[in-house]
C-alpha cells in the first residue's frame, strides 16, 4: 500500500512539472502547491496516520518543482524573445514579458543610439568631418540615412551608406544637427540616433592647434645644431619640400577634368557644324536646265527664221530690179 502511494505521488509530481513547463508561471505555481500538499499529506497518512503532515516537505517540493521549467526559458524562449524584439505586436512578444534580461535587451535594441566624431580636418573652404556609430547596428541594417542641417533651419543634406561611418563636407563656422536613421533587414523598422550638435568652428580650432604644435616641434628640431658626420642621416630623415617653377606651372595649368569639360564640347560643336555644312552642300536641290535649253532653242529657231526671211526678201528685190 505504501509503495503504491509513493508511485502515485511521483506520477502526480511529474504531471505537475510537465503542466508547469507548458503553461504560464502564474498557473503553474498554485497547481504545484496543491499537488505538493496532497503528496505530503498522503505520505504522512501512510507512514503515521496519527501524525500531522510536515510543512517543510511541501515547501521543498514547491521550491524544486519550477526549476526545470526555468531552464528551457533561458534557452529557446529567450532566443525567440530576442528575435522578436523589433516586433512588439507579434505573436511571440509574450515571451519577453517574463524575462528581465530579454526586456532590457529589447529596450537597448529599440532605444536611439549614439553618434561620435572620428576625425575632422580643414580642406580649402570646407571642413571634412567623419562620424561613426555602432557596427552591430550597421550590420543588422540594410542602409542608413545620414541627415545634416544647419541649426535654425536652412541647408539640408542627405547621404545613404551601408557602413558604420560617413564623411560629411560641412561649412566652417557653422552649427549643424546630424542624425542617422537605419532600417532593419528583417523587420524593416527604422531606428534613429540621438541628434549630434557639431560646431565646425570648434573642430577647426582643435585641428589647427594640433597642426601648429607639430609645426613648432619640427622647427625646434630644425634649429638644433647638427654634426657634419650625421648630415647624411638627417638629410635622409628630414626632407623639406621646396617649390620649383615646374610645380607652379603644373599647378597653374587646368586639370584634365576641367580641360575635358571645355575642349570636348568645342570639338563636338565644330564637328556638328561641319556635318551640317556637308549636308547642305550635297543635299541641296539642283537647278533644272532643260527649260532653259528649250528657250534657247526657240530663240535660235526664231533668229534663223528671221534671217532666212530677210534673205528671201533681198533675193526678191534683186529679181524685180
UniProtKB/Swiss-Prot annotation:
GO cellular component entries: membrane
Q: May I ask which residue range the UniProt record assigns to the signal sequence?
A: 1-18
- Primary location: membrane
Q: Effect of gene disruption?
A: Homozygotes are viable and fertile, display no obvious abnormalities in the development of the CNS, PNS or muscles. However, they exhibit highly specific defects in the innervation pattern of muscle 12, but no obvious defects in the innervation of other muscles. Both loss and gain of function mutants display altered neuromuscular specificity.
BP terms from Gene Ontology: motor neuron axon guidance
Places the protein is found:
Membrane
Query: For side Extracellular, which residue ranges?
Result: 19-261
**Which keywords accompany this UniProt record?**
Membrane, Signal, Transmembrane, Transmembrane helix
This protein's superkingdom?
Eukaryota
Membrane side Cytoplasmic: which residues?
283-321
Residue ranges of the TM segments:
262-282
Q: How does it sit in the membrane?
A: Single-pass type I membrane protein
The entry's function note states:
Involved in the normal targeting of ventral muscle, muscle 12, by motoneurons. May function as an axon guidance molecule involved in neuromuscular specificity.
Q: Could you tell me what this protein is called?
A: Transmembrane protein fend
Q: Which organism is it from?
A: Drosophila melanogaster (Fruit fly)
The upper taxonomy is: Eukaryota, Metazoa, Ecdysozoa, Arthropoda, Hexapoda
Amino acid at each position: 500500500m505504501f509503495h503504491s502511494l509513493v508511485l502515485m505521488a511521483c506520477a502526480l509530481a511529474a504531471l505537475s512539472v510537465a503542466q508547469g513547463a507548458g503553461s504560464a508561471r502564474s498557473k503553474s505555481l498554485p497547481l504545484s502547491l496543491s499537488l505538493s500538499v496532497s503528496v505530503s499529506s498522503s505520505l504522512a497518512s501512510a507512514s503515521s496516520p496519527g501524525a500531522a503532515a510536515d510543512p517543510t516537505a511541501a515547501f521543498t517540493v514547491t521550491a524544486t518543482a519550477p526549476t526545470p521549467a526555468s531552464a528551457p526559458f533561458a534557452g529557446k524562449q529567450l532566443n525567440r524573445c530576442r528575435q522578436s524584439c523589433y516586433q512588439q505586436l507579434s505573436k511571440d512578444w509574450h515571451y519577453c514579458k517574463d524575462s528581465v534580461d530579454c526586456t532590457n535587451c529589447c529596450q537597448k535594441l529599440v532605444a536611439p543610439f549614439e553618434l561620435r566624431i572620428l576625425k575632422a580636418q580643414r580642406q580649402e573652404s570646407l571642413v571634412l568631418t567623419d562620424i561613426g556609430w555602432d557596427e552591430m547596428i550597421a550590420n543588422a541594417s540594410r542602409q542608413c540615412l545620414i541627415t545634416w542641417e544647419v541649426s535654425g533651419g536652412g541647408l539640408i543634406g542627405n547621404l545613404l551608406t551601408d557602413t558604420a561611418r560617413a564623411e560629411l563636407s560641412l561649412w566652417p563656422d557653422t552649427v549643424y544637427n546630424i542624425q542617422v536613421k537605419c532600417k532593419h533587414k528583417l523587420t524593416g523598422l527604422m531606428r534613429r540616433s540621438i541628434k549630434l550638435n557639431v560646431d565646425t568652428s570648434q573642430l577647426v580650432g582643435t585641428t589647427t592647434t594640433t597642426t601648429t604644435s607639430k609645426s613648432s616641434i619640427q622647427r625646434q628640431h630644425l634649429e638644433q645644431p647638427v654634426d657634419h658626420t650625421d648630415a647624411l642621416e638627417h638629410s635622409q630623415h628630414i626632407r623639406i619640400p621646396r617649390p620649383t617653377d615646374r610645380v607652379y606651372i603644373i599647378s597653374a595649368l587646368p586639370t584634365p577634368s576641367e580641360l575635358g569639360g571645355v575642349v570636348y564640347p568645342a570639338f563636338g560643336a565644330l564637328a556638328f557644324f561641319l556635318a551640317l555644312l556637308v549636308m547642305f552642300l550635297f543635299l541641296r536641290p539642283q537647278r533644272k536646265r532643260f527649260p532653259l535649253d528649250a528657250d534657247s532653242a526657240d530663240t535660235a529657231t526664231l533668229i534663223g527664221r528671221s534671217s532666212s526671211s530677210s534673205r528671201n526678201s533681198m533675193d526678191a528685190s534683186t529679181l524685180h530690179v
